[in-house]
């Protein structure tokens, strides 16, 4: 399998350096499972001041990211056979685990476009295949959403995480939240590990974990629980 290529267009590319040394994600980069490239639109500005923003037409507060340097940075990126271009914007579709899995599985290259300032020139949207948001809130730029996508996709690539089972069992992988985890000691400050987990009965443990997943999802994320029930008709939980 070829290396998973990630290209980020950002005015602050240095913030992505930390990912190269971040736990299993950093090891994936060092092992060649994934590769990270950053592209600063300022390097493609053509005026003497390397200007990348300007006042909005029609007036208004703030500055708008200009299209020319962004397009130039984007067009300088090598194109892989299977590529997806993602625009970070609060107007985008809220990020879901299914999106991360799809991008990590179906594509060999992701290009992440990060806005800044008040916003970006509307014509920049034409570069993107999808627009992505972390939620209904606004940040100063698209770098944190981009870092989230990088982390979330690289960890799903084969060879990054030690065992595939750990990916299957975690929250959202099957539409439910993950079950509780415990480790030693068996008792800590009068809080005990459930006896079933110490019983050695693997069938009972599996049933307990499945019930915990359902209970947690129903209590903490009723929206996910309703969706799971709709996808599993006849299951009473």
UniProtKB/Swiss-Prot annotation:
S-adenosyl-L-methionine binds at residues 115, 134-139. Its EC number is 2.1.1.228. It catalyses: guanosine(37) in tRNA + S-adenosyl-L-methionine = N(1)-methylguanosine(37) in tRNA + S-adenosyl-L-homocysteine + H(+). Pfam families: tRNA_m1G_MT. GO terms for molecular function: tRNA (guanine(37)-N1)-methyltransferase activity. One of its GO terms (biological process) is tRNA N1-guanine methylation. GO terms for cellular component: cytosol. It comes from the Bacteria. Its main location: cytoplasm. The keyword Transferase applies. Signal peptide: none annotated. It is an enzyme of class 2 (transferase). Keywords: Cytoplasm, Methyltransferase, S-adenosyl-L-methionine, Transferase, tRNA processing. It is found in: Cytoplasm. Specifically methylates guanosine-37 in various tRNAs. Homodimer. Belongs to the RNA methyltransferase TrmD family. PANTHER family: TRNA (GUANINE-N(1)-)-METHYLTRANSFERASE (PTHR46417:SF1). This is tRNA (guanine-N(1)-)-methyltransferase. It comes from Synechococcus sp. (strain RCC307).
């Amino acid at each position: 399998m070829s290396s998973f290529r990630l290209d980020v267009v950002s005015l602050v590319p240095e913030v992505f350096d930390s990912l190269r040394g971040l736990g299993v994600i950093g090891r994936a980069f060092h092992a060649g499972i994934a590769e990270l490239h950053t592209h600063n639109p300022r390097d493609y500005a053509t005026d003497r001041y390397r200007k990348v923003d300007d006042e909005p037409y029609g007036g208004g507060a703030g500055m708008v990211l200009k299209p020319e340097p962004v397009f130039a940075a984007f067009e300088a990126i090598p194109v892989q056979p299977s590529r997806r271009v993602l625009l970070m914007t609060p107007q985008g579709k809220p990020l879901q685990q299914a999106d991360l899995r799809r991008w990590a599985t179906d594509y060999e290259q992701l290009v992440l476009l990060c806005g800044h300032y008040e916003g970006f020139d509307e014509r920049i949207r034409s570069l993107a295949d999808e627009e992505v948001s972390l939620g209904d809130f606004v940040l100063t730029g698209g770098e944190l959403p981009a870092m989230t996508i990088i982390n979330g996709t690289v960890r799903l690539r084969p060879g990054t995480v030690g065992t595939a089972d750990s990916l299957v069992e975690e929250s959202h992988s099957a539409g439910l939240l993950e079950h509780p985890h415990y480790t030693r000691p068996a008792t800590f400050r009068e809080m005990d590990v459930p006896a079933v987990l110490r019983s050695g009965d693997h069938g009972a443990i599996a049933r307990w974990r499945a019930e915990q997943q359902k209970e947690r999802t129903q209590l903490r994320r009723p929206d996910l629980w309703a969706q799971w029930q709709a996808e599993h008709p006849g299951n009473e939980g």
